[in-house]
Amino acid sequence: GTPGGEYRVVEVNPRVSRSSALASKATGYPIARVTAKVALGKRLHEIENEITGETTAAFEPAIDYVVTKVPRWPKDKFDDVEFELGPAMKSTGEAMSIGRTFEESLLKALRSSEYDPAVDWGDVPDGELEAEYLERPTPDRPYAILEAFYRGYTVEEIHELTGIYEWYLERFGRIAEAAESARNGEFEPAAEAGFTNQEIAAIAGGEFNDTHASWIPSEATDADAEDGRQVETDGGGTVVEDVEADTSRRTFKQVDTCAGEFRASTPYYYSAREPPTGRGASEVQIDRDIESVVVVGGGPIRIGQGVEFDYCAVHAVRALENMGIDAHVVNNNPETVSTDYDTSDGLFFEPITAEEIADIVEETNADGVMVQFGGQTSVNVGEPLEDELGRRDLDCEILGTSVEAMDLAEDRDRFNALMDELEISQPEGGAATSR
């Protein structure tokens, strides 16, 4: 859009594209399937909606949630490249998130993108924050906006610097306010805004034990050691345990194409942090007494990790189903087959973090988790997930190669030491890095 309210069409594709794939995943409406049937002569009212089983393709999808898509920027591979927004495409993939509010959906999308700004905001003065990070449209800008609000900037000031509509900036401001509340010991506003318990604990002065965070204010990580309120806990336990005791749990909602007007039977879910007086309990329709396994997907496509790993995840799901075991997928990439609602027994469109996967394990009563089929993303979540499952005392294990063995194989120094200990010959080698 433009300041005058006009919209400019950049391109039109007369075919199924990544945009239509995103629209399908966001609404649950099977655009490609319906398009194929229309091309064969079917009318919309003759095509059944498989999700509800009661309506037809002539019903326009209605949604009662917010969907956010963010690009995956390969800044970790090209540290010296300028990733300023322009006519040339520089992202390698994308992540999608679903939440009840814009704030919740945005924070889930930032976690899902697995992007970590290579900047310590505590070392960035206001002038540099404005000139380098707010005025310039770069991958760091969303985090800079949150940091600016946390420093006391107003909506009007940030609007002047970024040109972003005030409605969106007001939501960014609410996220920053929720973080400030968490820093002062009020955890529920941060939970409802979409922060994870691990993120809230880190904001409050505790440790962060997970793979990726959406945003943690610089002041929270630079807190004064003498500031007792940062590390005090109510019950003598860890900060994250206090956060869990004082906040609402995640409930899982269904993507049904009709905003709850008709009963849906397709197992396509997303989580929401709502207070007990919210819109009801979990909507998951899964038999918790059947043996089941959670398969962790690969998240957004990046250099070195593409759709070949999604192929692995989908075939893992099919192998489990052939064995009579329910397979549940957790992933957030709208471009993949694993996030089709009819690929698995349960699709959870969620960030790939230990906390959120552990919530899915609790919800489904899963017997095991497979992290070997999503590339480095899913392997990286193995260790914190094992810790989280143990902390919650859940009867669920990482299946296949153990987390310890995975680390042993990936850590070249440890692997070389093991080969020497076992007296197994290997070529001489070394590692070098420019950073």
Predicted regions and their residues:
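Intrinsically disordered, low-complexity basic tails/linkers immediately adjacent to helix-turn-helix/homeobox/MYB/SANT
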Residues: 185-204, 263-279
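Periplasmic-binding protein-like
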Residues: 367-373
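Acidic/polar loop patches that form or flank catalytic/metal-binding clefts of enzymes
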Residues: 42-50, 119, 156, 201, ...
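Short, acidic/small-residue loops that bind anionic groups at enzyme active sites
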Residues: 323-324, 391-406
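ATP-dependent carboxylate activation and anion-phosphoryl transfer catalytic cores
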Residues: 1-181, 190-193, 217, 222-229, ...
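Active-site nucleotide/adenylate-binding loops and adjacent lid/helix of ATP-dependent enzymes
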Residues: 13-14, 362, 406-435
